[in-house]
């Protein structure tokens, strides 16, 4: 059975959207992992009584002021939180469109039988 052009187009959109959604979810997960690592680093630094910590820079450890490193990490955390929020919004919109396309395709395929 040959599918009408509009149904083929919807199927193609559905597959593309599925791939985009997977990519968004993957990227969001990557940012969430980085976020947790940085939050854990701040938590561990706060346990230390030392005013200096070591920070990885280009494959070497460099001694740095704890307050400066904490401030840098806090800024990075803020940026990552914004990115995660942005990805969550994109994911939500795509998920809605994905569901709409899926329902539309199911209707069309159901009528064709």
Swiss-Prot record:
Q: Which residues form a coiled coil?
A: none
Q: Which molecular-function annotations from GO does this UniProt entry contain?
A: protein-folding chaperone binding; unfolded protein binding
Q: Which UniProt keywords apply?
A: Chaperone, Cytoplasm
Q: Output the Pfam families linked to this UniProt entry.
A: Prefoldin_2
Q: Which InterPro entries does this one have?
A: PFD_beta-like, PfdB, Prefoldin
Q: Which GO terms describe its biological process?
A: chaperone-mediated protein complex assembly; protein folding
Q: Which CDD domains match?
A: Prefoldin_beta_GimC
Q: Where, per UniProt, does this protein localize?
A: Cytoplasm
- Mind naming one GO cellular-component term on file for this protein? prefoldin complex
The subunit field of the Swiss-Prot or TrEMBL record says:
Heterohexamer of two alpha and four beta subunits.
Name the protein family. Answer: Belongs to the prefoldin subunit beta family.
Function, in words: Molecular chaperone capable of stabilizing a range of proteins. Seems to fulfill an ATP-independent, HSP70-like function in archaeal de novo protein folding.
Protein name per Swiss-Prot or TrEMBL: Prefoldin subunit beta
Q: What is the primary gene name for this protein?
A: pfdB
């Amino acid at each position: 059975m040959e599918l009408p052009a509009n149904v083929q187009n919807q199927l193609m959109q559905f597959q593309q959207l599925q791939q985009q959604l997977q990519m968004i979810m993957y990227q969001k997960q990557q940012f969430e992992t980085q976020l947790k690592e940085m939050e854990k680093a701040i938590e561990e630094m706060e346990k230390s009584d030392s005013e200096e910590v070591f920070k990885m820079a280009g494959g070497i450890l460099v001694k740095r002021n704890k307050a400066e490193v904490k401030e840098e990490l806090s800024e990075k955390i803020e940026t990552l939180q914004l990115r995660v929020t942005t990805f969550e919004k994109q994911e939500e919109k795509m998920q809605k469109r994905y569901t709409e396309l899926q329902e539309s395709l199911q209707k069309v395929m159901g009528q064709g039988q």
